[in-house]
Amino acid sequence: MAALDRRLELDAKLREILGNDNTYFGPPASVIMHYPCIRYSRSYIDTVYADNNPYLRRKRYELILIYEDADDDLPDKLMDELTVAHNRHYVADNLHHDVFTMYF
């Protein structure tokens, strides 16, 4: 499967979990985001070698779930649907941010 196809598959899963189209892959600063949303980017590529050739590549993504209501169940929903590791939570500009890491 091509890398773009795989990322678009991830994007579709994120949209399904959110229940809207507010997913942003590495958006430029000029993009106006609508909430709740998920902003995500590739953070690392883990390569396994066999006989000095790349055998397996796993891409790690950082996902930031951004939402307004502190009682929103979106973080739980995301953790129920995907294999993610929760890294931290913070509030900025009166918006809640949950940062997750996942391989996809």
Model regions: which residues?
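Short, cysteine-centered beta-strand-loop-beta hairpins and adjacent loop/turn segments enriched
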Residues: 47-48, 69-70
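Short intrinsically disordered coil segments
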Residues: 53-58, 78-81
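Oligomerization/assembly interface segments of phage tail-like spikes and tubes
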Residues: 57-69, 96-104
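A generic structural signal for short, non-catalytic loop/turn and secondary-structure boundary residues
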Residues: 31-33, 56, 93-95
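Acidic-leaning, charged glycine-interspersed low-complexity segments
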Residues: 77-104
